[in-house]
């Protein structure tokens, strides 16, 4: 009976005593806002010289594992990058290179695609990393940097159109780009075509509605 009472008291103590429960902030912070202010300090020391602007965490939160995540918007949301801070391990991971190179990347794609073609850069993906890739060409050719590109055509697609898609894909690949290209005529879509490959014209023309 005494043992049972002691066991109950120990259980109550674990519940009530501060620090005995799992704390996603590891006792370092009180809330997400405090973490955000701390991470703001870190990212400004690391990256502000590259962006020439004060960097602030937005859309942030902390998961149950104690990993704080946020999006950093740069130049009035012209581009952005993500950060993750592990509160317990005190480690920061970021894809800041994405934001740093994003504007130039879009310009590079725009200069590669003929003016006669309509397109949309649907996404630029970059795995979060501790390192910062300052060299643009190293960033583009990095295996973690991937683009998703959509090319638009009106109505029927000719063989010449399909060959133009092949040329665009080769040009992007020659520049070091990784990722995928897909064609759309407004209703139908081609296969998802991987950069670095030479797709068959028939696979490209699957977006044809005739």
Report residues per predicted region.
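A short, surface-exposed beta-strand/turn
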Residues: 79-100
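Exposed beta-strand-loop-beta-strand "reactive/processing" segments of non-cytosolic proteins
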Residues: 51-85
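C-terminal motif of bacterial Sec signal peptides marking the signal peptidase cleavage site
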Residues: 16-19
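Positively charged n-region of N-terminal signal peptides that target proteins for export
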Residues: 1-5, 9
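Extracytoplasmic electrostatic interaction patches
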Residues: 97-210
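Acidic/histidine-rich, surface-exposed loop or edge segments in extracytoplasmic proteins
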Residues: 21-25, 87-91, 143-155
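Repetitive helical segments and hydrophobic/amphipathic motifs
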Residues: 12-13
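Short, non-transmembrane alpha-helical segments in secretory-pathway proteins
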Residues: 23-56, 105-114
